[in-house]
Amino acid sequence: WSLLPREVQTVIIASFFVAMGYGVIVPSIPIYSRSFGVSAAAVGWVISAFAIVRFISGMFSGKLVNIFGERKVYFVGVLMVSISSLLAAIAQNYWQLLAFRTAGGLGSSMFSVASSSVIFKSVSSDLRARTQSIYNGGFLVGAIAGPAIGGLLMSISLRAPFFVYSVVLLISGAIAFGYLHASHLEPSQNKDEDVMSIKDALSNKAFRIALATAFLFGWAVLGPRLSIVPLFVVEDLHGTNALVGFVYTISALVQGAFLMRAGQLSDRLGRRPILQIGAVITWFAMAMFIFANHTSLFIAAMIVLGIGSAFLSTTPSSMVGDVIKGRSGKVIGFFQMATDGGMIVGPIISGYLADVSNYRTAFTATLAVYSITLLLAWRVPETLVTVAQNREQA
């Protein structure tokens, strides 16, 4: 922690509050939406609309970072989500709630891209993966703590979590605005400063593989974990909702425990072997879901998935940080869109397959798609300069 620049420490602390606040409202979103007397599909739109806007605004957010700098974009983005959450808390009908949550998606995209840009620009390559691990770990801790607080607030009112989320976001924004003062985070006055275009980034093989890996991770891991996996446990394995919540917490704790180690190994051994390790572990975890006929096997699969996710959640972003140059907000936004896009596509396809066939068919198809990651992991070039140079000399 002491090795990190102050601006990176600031982003990590601020993002912890963002993640905790989001965790506070996660349990209440579907129930609060349902309280307006709408269908389950309509409830789904409240959740999906936020993700869709995040997806389509990724490049726009990146352009804003290039023009105005990370500090201002982060603060305005957090402020937008805070205001939209406050408005959602006082929504009088479903359509108002949908509109306010949709508007919040743009703000979420803005502060996410700004956060990544701060990390990529502020740390050296030999510290990048560890920094990303700490950043992801902060999000995990916040996401674990949030739902417990949200559950207590829901006993007071379904609107209460949104009020609290709004306040927590203001705290996050104030921290960022007060401490993000590094000169390299301000908008440049040099019109000739090197700006990496998306076309330039796509010409790099490692960037293309990082992009594809992030998309597949969103599709096959993050998406189903938020959609069909809980339903599989309750409807197929006859587990309880409490069991789902408990196991998800255990999986997140395991992921958090391995995050720092994964980052250290990535900075020492290189991105390529860590991507391979993560891809293989995650593949086996997903295969375990297909054969899980008891809750004990589900628990084991989620623990293994937590380990694999620790390696996979940091490596692609570290690879992107290795290859970008100059003011690269649009490239970072484009990369963020990959994961968001996968999280939109994954639940739709896996949910459809579960409806027309069964959960195991959905898991099998998802595993088949994810297998592409194994091929990519063995084709990716090393992006950590020191490791790549040592291999060439050897």
Model-assigned labels for residue ranges:
Residues 84, 95-103, 285, 296-304:
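Paired small-residue
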Residues 1-5, 181-211, 393-394:
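Juxtamembrane intracellular "pre-TM" segments in multi-pass secondary transporters
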Residues 51-59, 143-144, 252-260, 343-344:
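Residue-level signature of mid-helix packing/kink "hotspots" within the transmembrane helices
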Residues 72-86, 273-288:
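Structural signature of the two symmetry-related core transmembrane helices
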Residues 28-40, 227-242:
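Short amphipathic helix-loop junctions that connect adjacent transmembrane helices
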Residues 37, 69, 90-95, 238, ...:
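Helix-breaking motifs and short loop linkers at transmembrane-helix boundaries and internal kinks
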Residues 58-69, 259-270, 354:
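Helix-to-loop junctions at the C-terminal end of transmembrane segments
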Residues 100-139, 319, 323:
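Cytoplasmic helix-loop-helix junction between adjacent transmembrane helices
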